[in-house]
Protein backbone atom coordinates (compact mmCIF):
# COMPACT_ATOMS: atom_id res chain seq x y z
CA UNK A 1 0.00 0.00 0.00
CA UNK A 2 2.82 2.44 0.79
CA UNK A 3 4.45 1.78 -2.61
CA UNK A 4 1.20 2.74 -4.36
CA UNK A 5 1.03 5.87 -2.26
CA UNK A 6 4.60 6.77 -3.18
CA UNK A 7 3.94 6.13 -6.88
CA UNK A 8 0.82 8.29 -6.71
CA UNK A 9 2.72 11.08 -4.94
CA UNK A 10 5.51 10.87 -7.53
CA UNK A 11 2.99 11.10 -10.38
CA UNK A 12 1.40 14.18 -8.82
CA UNK A 13 4.81 15.79 -8.31
CA UNK A 14 5.81 15.05 -11.90
CA UNK A 15 2.51 16.45 -13.17
CA UNK A 16 3.10 19.60 -11.10
CA UNK A 17 6.60 20.02 -12.53
CA UNK A 18 5.32 19.57 -16.10
CA UNK A 19 2.50 22.08 -15.47
CA UNK A 20 4.91 24.61 -13.95
CA UNK A 21 7.32 24.24 -16.88
CA UNK A 22 4.47 24.74 -19.36
CA UNK A 23 3.33 27.87 -17.50
CA UNK A 24 6.91 29.17 -17.44
CA UNK A 25 7.31 28.58 -21.18
CA UNK A 26 3.94 30.23 -21.86
CA UNK A 27 4.97 33.27 -19.80
CA UNK A 28 8.32 33.54 -21.58
CA UNK A 29 6.57 33.36 -24.94
CA UNK A 30 4.03 35.99 -23.88
CA UNK A 31 6.90 38.31 -22.95
CA UNK A 32 8.55 37.70 -26.31
CA UNK A 33 5.33 38.36 -28.19
CA UNK A 34 4.63 41.51 -26.18
CA UNK A 35 7.88 42.89 -27.56
CA UNK A 36 6.17 43.56 -30.88
CA UNK A 37 6.93 47.21 -30.78
CA UNK A 38 3.75 49.35 -30.78
CA UNK A 39 5.84 52.03 -32.50
CA UNK A 40 6.11 49.64 -35.46
CA UNK A 41 2.31 49.72 -35.83
CA UNK A 42 2.07 53.49 -35.35
CA UNK A 43 4.93 54.21 -37.76
CA UNK A 44 3.48 51.87 -40.37
CA UNK A 45 0.07 53.50 -40.14
CA UNK A 46 1.69 56.95 -40.34
CA UNK A 47 3.50 55.81 -43.50
CA UNK A 48 0.20 54.63 -45.00
CA UNK A 49 -1.43 57.99 -44.23
CA UNK A 50 1.50 59.84 -45.80
CA UNK A 51 1.38 57.63 -48.91
CA UNK A 52 -2.36 58.13 -49.25
CA UNK A 53 -2.11 61.90 -48.84
CA UNK A 54 0.55 61.96 -51.55
CA UNK A 55 -1.46 59.90 -54.04
CA UNK A 56 0.65 56.76 -53.59
CA UNK A 57 -2.38 54.55 -53.01
CA UNK A 58 -0.89 51.45 -54.67
CA UNK A 59 2.04 51.53 -52.23
CA UNK A 60 -0.33 52.19 -49.32
CA UNK A 61 -2.36 49.13 -50.36
CA UNK A 62 0.77 46.95 -50.48
CA UNK A 63 1.84 48.16 -47.03
CA UNK A 64 -1.62 47.71 -45.47
CA UNK A 65 -1.96 44.23 -46.97
CA UNK A 66 1.44 43.25 -45.57
CA UNK A 67 0.48 44.72 -42.18
CA UNK A 68 -2.82 42.80 -42.08
CA UNK A 69 -1.09 39.53 -42.97
CA UNK A 70 1.72 40.27 -40.50
CA UNK A 71 -0.79 40.61 -37.66
CA UNK A 72 -2.88 37.64 -38.82
CA UNK A 73 0.17 35.43 -38.26
CA UNK A 74 1.27 37.32 -35.11
CA UNK A 75 -2.06 36.75 -33.46
CA UNK A 76 -2.80 33.35 -35.07
CA UNK A 77 -5.72 32.56 -32.80
CA UNK A 78 -3.65 32.11 -29.67
CA UNK A 79 -1.39 29.40 -31.05
CA UNK A 80 2.22 29.84 -29.94
CA UNK A 81 3.62 27.14 -32.22
CA UNK A 82 3.35 27.58 -35.99
CA UNK A 83 4.80 25.90 -39.09
CA UNK A 84 8.13 27.31 -40.24
CA UNK A 85 6.38 28.26 -43.51
CA UNK A 86 4.15 30.66 -41.53
CA UNK A 87 7.13 32.05 -39.60
CA UNK A 88 8.93 32.77 -42.87
CA UNK A 89 5.76 34.34 -44.31
CA UNK A 90 5.54 36.54 -41.21
CA UNK A 91 9.15 37.62 -41.79
CA UNK A 92 8.37 38.33 -45.46
CA UNK A 93 5.49 40.67 -44.52
CA UNK A 94 7.60 42.40 -41.87
CA UNK A 95 10.40 42.96 -44.40
CA UNK A 96 7.96 44.25 -47.04
CA UNK A 97 6.78 46.91 -44.60
CA UNK A 98 10.24 47.84 -43.40
CA UNK A 99 11.71 48.04 -46.92
CA UNK A 100 8.98 50.52 -47.83
CA UNK A 101 9.44 52.53 -44.63
CA UNK A 102 13.20 52.66 -45.13
CA UNK A 103 12.81 53.56 -48.81
CA UNK A 104 14.44 50.38 -50.09
CA UNK A 105 17.76 50.96 -48.32
CA UNK A 106 18.13 47.19 -48.22
CA UNK A 107 17.07 44.06 -50.07
CA UNK A 108 15.93 40.83 -48.49
CA UNK A 109 16.03 37.21 -49.59
CA UNK A 110 14.13 34.39 -47.89
CA UNK A 111 14.97 30.82 -48.90
CA UNK A 112 13.82 27.50 -47.50
CA UNK A 113 15.34 24.15 -48.40
CA UNK A 114 12.90 21.44 -49.43
CA UNK A 115 11.13 19.83 -46.49
CA UNK A 116 11.87 22.45 -43.84
CA UNK A 117 8.66 24.46 -44.03
CA UNK A 118 6.28 21.98 -42.40
CA UNK A 119 8.02 21.42 -39.04
CA UNK A 120 6.86 23.83 -36.34
CA UNK A 121 8.64 26.54 -34.40
CA UNK A 122 7.87 29.06 -31.70
CA UNK A 123 5.95 31.93 -33.24
CA UNK A 124 7.76 35.28 -33.79
CA UNK A 125 11.25 33.91 -33.31
CA UNK A 126 12.72 35.55 -36.45
CA UNK A 127 11.13 39.02 -36.30
CA UNK A 128 13.14 40.38 -33.32
CA UNK A 129 16.36 39.35 -35.09
CA UNK A 130 15.23 41.13 -38.25
CA UNK A 131 14.34 44.18 -36.19
CA UNK A 132 17.89 44.28 -34.80
CA UNK A 133 19.39 43.83 -38.27
CA UNK A 134 17.32 46.71 -39.64
CA UNK A 135 17.65 49.17 -36.78
CA UNK A 136 21.34 48.55 -36.11
CA UNK A 137 22.56 48.01 -39.64
CA UNK A 138 20.20 48.62 -42.53
CA UNK A 139 18.89 51.99 -41.30
CA UNK A 140 22.29 53.41 -42.25
CA UNK A 141 22.65 51.53 -45.52
CA UNK A 142 22.68 53.46 -48.78
CA UNK A 143 20.58 51.07 -50.82
CA UNK A 144 23.20 48.35 -50.59
CA UNK A 145 22.00 46.64 -47.42
CA UNK A 146 21.21 42.94 -47.62
CA UNK A 147 19.34 40.66 -45.25
CA UNK A 148 19.21 36.93 -45.96
CA UNK A 149 17.07 34.32 -44.24
CA UNK A 150 17.80 30.67 -44.93
CA UNK A 151 15.83 27.80 -43.40
CA UNK A 152 17.87 24.61 -43.73
CA UNK A 153 18.33 21.13 -42.32
CA UNK A 154 21.25 20.22 -40.11
CA UNK A 155 20.82 16.53 -39.34
CA UNK A 156 17.49 16.18 -37.54
CA UNK A 157 17.34 19.90 -36.74
CA UNK A 158 16.01 22.80 -38.77
CA UNK A 159 18.18 25.91 -38.59
CA UNK A 160 16.96 29.38 -39.53
CA UNK A 161 19.97 31.55 -40.39
CA UNK A 162 19.52 35.33 -40.48
CA UNK A 163 22.49 37.23 -41.88
CA UNK A 164 23.06 40.81 -42.97
CA UNK A 165 25.88 42.93 -44.32
CA UNK A 166 25.55 45.62 -41.65
CA UNK A 167 28.49 46.88 -39.60
CA UNK A 168 28.14 44.11 -37.00
CA UNK A 169 29.47 44.22 -33.45
CA UNK A 170 33.04 44.23 -32.19
CA UNK A 171 34.28 40.69 -31.43
CA UNK A 172 34.69 41.43 -27.70
CA UNK A 173 31.03 42.50 -27.46
CA UNK A 174 29.93 39.25 -29.14
CA UNK A 175 32.13 37.21 -26.77
CA UNK A 176 30.72 39.03 -23.74
CA UNK A 177 27.14 38.47 -24.92
CA UNK A 178 27.79 34.76 -25.41
CA UNK A 179 29.61 34.34 -22.07
CA UNK A 180 27.06 33.05 -19.54
CA UNK A 181 29.31 34.17 -16.65
CA UNK A 182 29.80 37.74 -17.90
CA UNK A 183 28.26 40.42 -15.67
CA UNK A 184 25.16 41.99 -17.18
CA UNK A 185 24.46 45.69 -16.93
CA UNK A 186 20.78 46.56 -16.99
CA UNK A 187 20.64 49.22 -19.70
CA UNK A 188 16.88 49.26 -19.98
CA UNK A 189 17.08 48.49 -23.69
CA UNK A 190 15.88 45.45 -25.60
CA UNK A 191 17.76 43.30 -28.04
CA UNK A 192 21.39 42.93 -28.91
CA UNK A 193 23.16 45.26 -31.28
Which role does the model predict for each range below?
Residues 1-36, 40-192:
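Two-component histidine phosphotransfer core
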Amino acid sequence: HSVRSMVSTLRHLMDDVVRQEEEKRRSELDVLQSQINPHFLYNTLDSVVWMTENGRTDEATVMLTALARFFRISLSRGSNIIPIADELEHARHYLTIQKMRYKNKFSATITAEDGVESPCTIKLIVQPILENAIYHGMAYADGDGEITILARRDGDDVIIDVTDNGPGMPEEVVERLLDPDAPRANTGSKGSG
